[in-house]
A protein has these predicted regions:
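Short beta-strand edge/turn micro-motifs at domain boundaries
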Residues: 114-116, 123-149
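Beta-strand-connecting loop/turn residues
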Residues: 55, 110-111, 133-134
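Surface-exposed, charged secondary-structure patches
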Residues: 22, 58-63, 68-121
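Residue-level "edge-of-site" marker
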Residues: 54, 62, 143
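Bacterial N-terminal signal peptides
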Residues: 5-14
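Short, low-complexity N-terminal intrinsically disordered segments enriched in polar/charged residues
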Residues: 19-47, 51, 55, 73, ...
Length: 152
C-alpha cells in the first residue's frame, strides 16, 4: 500500500511538469495560427486563412473611413475573409510596405487561447479554440487605429 501511495504521489507530482512542458508548444502553435491569419490577409493567401480561421468565425469591429470620422460597426463573415484575400491577389487591399505585424499572446489553456494582433487595419483581439487538435480563430473583436492626439 505504501508503494502504491508513493507511486501515485510521483505521478501526481509529474503531471504539472508535463502540462508546463506542453505550454510553450501550445503558445507557439497559437502564435503560428495568428501569424497565418495576418499573413493570409497581408499576402492574400487563402490557404493560411483556411488553416487558421474556423469557418464559424465571428469577426466584429469598429472602423473609421478617415481619421476624423466616427466609428461604425462592421461585421466580417468567413466568406468575406476569402474575398479579401482574393482582392489582395488581384492587387487591391494591399498592406503598406511598413505594415505592423505585432502578435501578443495573452493566455493559453488546454482548449482556449487569447491573443492581440496589431496590423495595418488596426487592432484585433482574437479568441482561439482547439478544434481537432489545431488552434483555430473563432472570434475576433477589432477596431481601426484610435485617433491620434492633436498636436500643438
Amino acid at each position: 500500500m505504501r508503494v502504491l501511495a508513493l507511486t501515485a504521489a510521483v505521478i501526481l507530482a509529474a503531471l504539472p511538469a508535463r502540462a508546463a512542458a506542453q505550454q510553450p508548444d501550445d503558445r507557439e502553435q497559437v502564435r503560428l495560427a495568428v501569424a497565418d491569419y495576418v499573413d493570409g490577409f497581408y499576402q492574400g493567401d487563402s490557404t493560411r486563412l483556411v488553416r487558421s480561421v474556423s469557418p464559424e468565425v465571428r469577426k466584429n469591429g469598429y472602423w473609421r473611413a478617415s481619421p476624423d470620422s466616427a466609428y461604425r460597426p462592421s461585421a466580417m463573415p468567413y466568406p468575406a475573409f476569402m474575398r479579401f484575400a482574393a482582392g489582395v491577389q488581384a492587387g487591391r487591399n494591399r498592406p503598406p510596405a511598413n505594415a505592423p505585424r505585432e502578435i501578443v499572446i495573452f493566455d493559453v489553456q488546454d482548449q482556449t487561447a487569447s491573443a492581440k494582433l496589431t496590423a495595418w487595419w488596426g487592432t484585433d483581439y482574437l479568441l482561439l479554440g482547439r478544434e481537432n487538435g489545431r488552434w483555430m480563430i473563432t472570434h475576433v473583436l477589432w477596431q481601426s487605429p484610435p485617433p491620434r492626439p492633436a498636436t500643438r
